[in-house]
Curated annotation (Swiss-Prot):
Species annotation: Fragaria ananassa (Strawberry)
GO molecular function list: abscisic acid binding; protein phosphatase inhibitor activity; signaling receptor activity
Keyword terms of this UniProt record: Allergen, Flavonoid biosynthesis, Pathogenesis-related protein, Plant defense
Subunit: Monomer. Interacts with AP.
Protein name: Major strawberry allergen Fra a 1-3
Gene: FRAA3
Note: Fruits silencing FRAA3 exhibit loss of pigmentation in mature fruits due to the lack of anthocyanin biosynthesis.
SUPFAM superfamilies tied to this protein: Bet v1-like
Residues that bind (2R,3S)-catechin: H70
Tissue: Highly expressed in open flowers. Expressed in roots, leaves and flower buds. Expressed at low levels in ripe red fruits.
Family statement drawn from the similarity comment of this UniProt entry: Belongs to the BetVI family.
Gene Ontology BP annotations: abscisic acid-activated signaling pathway; defense response; flavonoid biosynthetic process
Superkingdom of this protein's organism: Eukaryota
Amino acid sequence: MGVFTYESEFTSVIPPPKLFKAFVLDADNLIPKIAPQAVKSAEIIEGDGGVGTIKKIHLGEGSEYSYVKHKIDGIDKDNFVYSYSIIEGDAIGDKIEKISYEIKLVASGGGSIIKSTSHYHTKGEVEIKEEHVKAGKERAAGLFKIIENHLLAHPEEYN
């Protein structure tokens, strides 16, 4: 098994507490509402929404994949850190065991820096193609922008 690690950063004008509430704590409700092309729905398969919870995310028509299962590995509401793993779904195929993510929101000039670390755990000595990672980063950046625009248009939400 190989492990490949990738890091990325995005910036947002939304401060970490508000962005964390929207993007992490209420994502299962918010994202299908504002970005149905990305996520159709989310359901808890096992757990109570905390660490260890497994969710099935039904992806939207804009995705080339149909679903993924997320396992929540950690939620730190005080430091705005969220970690989870994609453990199943057509997005990981038969060459990847899981993809683990850590997302950290850091305050910066009234907004946030979103720091994301991805660990691809492969089956055997498979190499992850750069275009696969780049496409994932672009989807994530696009989703952050949709959430940011929603929060700017609805400043009363997630205070």
